[in-house]
Amino acid sequence: GMLRAEGDLKVTALYNQPEIFYAGYPRNVEISDNPADYDYFDEEAQVWVKRISATLCPRVYIYLVQVVLYNNDGRITGTTGETAISGFASGTNVNTGHTNNKPCQVYFDTAMRRNVSVEGRMADVAAGRLTTFGLCDMESYVVSSKSEYKGGRPEVNNYLYVPLQFRNGTQKTITVEVTDQCQSQCHGGVITVFIDCGTIPIPEGSGGGNVFVPTVEDYEEVDYDIEM
């Protein structure tokens, strides 16, 4: 369901999106004193060389997030660019891809497209791309794995915060729980939220209006928790 964000909602640590990267983790690799265990001898470097095959797997996953606005009729003019989803892991192990147990909230940009046909109905759509390490305490993606979340923190919910701008200059952030969508596609996918704009009253006044923006004061740069 859709809830209006209130100031007393618990906001987890705030992060920007991680860059996309991949890693390989070959197992059971040993240093041997038997030349027969190597592939060839490098005459120039004077060392025995063994080729190691490794499959690069993603350590960062991509979600495409779309907020479908039905019955807008020009009421909502855009988003503020401070869209965020909470409940994602704040770090990962580069070798194993196993994510940590520290939930965070990740920001991403959204842009508005108007008069788009969605499931046979015309709507405005606010959409954006989100990159994340995935959910907390989660195994990495492998080709044979399923996308359903099997980690140890299913109680950590995911909330989508969408700051909306209205035609009278006011703003309001709505909150939608997207836990089921995130846990059913924990290695990335498409998150879709449908909103009937006729059920959202336009805030009175002008300018900032009645708005909750999930940010913090006295911001300082924080490094991601990435284990080697």
Model segments located where?
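Short, low-hydrophobicity acidic/polar segments
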Residues: 1-59
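Primarily extracytoplasmic ectodomains and periplasmic/lumenal surface modules that are beta-strand-rich
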Residues: 72-74
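Hydrophobic, glycine-enriched assembly/anchoring segments
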Residues: 187-228
